[in-house]
């Protein structure tokens, strides 16, 4: 399947209705790396009823116990760090679940949701995220339908994304993505999509944290003209004011990205898909294969 075809699957992924059965728990721990791990990052920002802790390493926190819902996410099912963390969680009697397309993780005896194979992990964000949303948030049918509609529209018209990609390419810019709650993880997702799809370095941060660090170099950093600032528009007046003032006092020009949708679910997936198409178009302009992750695979083999 070509990457352009993978993009077209996201709208159907938001209708993936699988969920886990959970018992009494007082915390959630989600383990995942790379394209699989981003689902946990996004979920942790939109769910606040119980503490959510993310694991992107071999080891798990000491507080994991029998009141922990532990979700291991690995698209391939063979991610070394995630398998190690899952084994540790099981030893500590956590309620371990898994989201995977197969591999070793699917054979470990955990409560497992099997998702379709044949995609890049980062192109499976709906399959990886929706089981978490369905289990712990339980979205309204109308919210899912709205997300489906917006994604369908983006599939048909992504000229804005193509235009931004052209500006970045023609100026040989380094993308800098700024978000704010509840889209901080989406800003990071864009950063990683620039990395993997377009094969360019990128940087992400979020308001208002960046006003306590990034603000200083924004005005006078060297090679300032090489950066291209992409900022998610916020309907929170506190963040909106910070964005406006930051742009003004640092003398930068922010390329504002509107967030379409009325429900949070629709907004999240709209921004995800916007970034997917933007980085896909940049990959095309650069003449690189957005599906190629050969260096990452080579690294895995070297350290195995």
Curated annotation (Swiss-Prot):
It catalyses: alpha-D-glucose 6-phosphate = beta-D-fructose 6-phosphate; D-mannose 6-phosphate = D-fructose 6-phosphate. SUPFAM superfamilies: SIS domain. Its EC number is 5.3.1.8, 5.3.1.9. Pfam families: bact-PGI_C, SIS. Gene3D superfamilies: Glucose-6-phosphate isomerase like protein, domain 1. It comes from the Archaea. Residues 16-147 form the SIS domain. The active site is at 196 (proton acceptor), 212 (proton donor), 300 (proton acceptor). One of its GO terms (biological process) is carbohydrate derivative metabolic process. GO terms for molecular function: carbohydrate derivative binding; glucose-6-phosphate isomerase activity; mannose-6-phosphate isomerase activity. CDD domains: SIS_PGI_PMI_1, SIS_PGI_PMI_2. Keywords: Carbohydrate metabolism, Isomerase. The keyword Lipoprotein does not apply. D-fructose 6-phosphate binds at residues 35-36, 74, 76, 79, 122, 212, 300. Belongs to the PGI/PMI family. Dual specificity isomerase that catalyzes the isomerization of both glucose-6-phosphate and mannose-6-phosphate to fructose-6-phosphate. Homodimer. This is Bifunctional phosphoglucose/phosphomannose isomerase. It comes from Thermoplasma volcanium (strain ATCC 51530 / DSM 4299 / JCM 9571 / NBRC 15438 / GSS1). The lineage of its organism: Archaea, Methanobacteriati, Thermoplasmatota, Thermoplasmata, Thermoplasmatales.
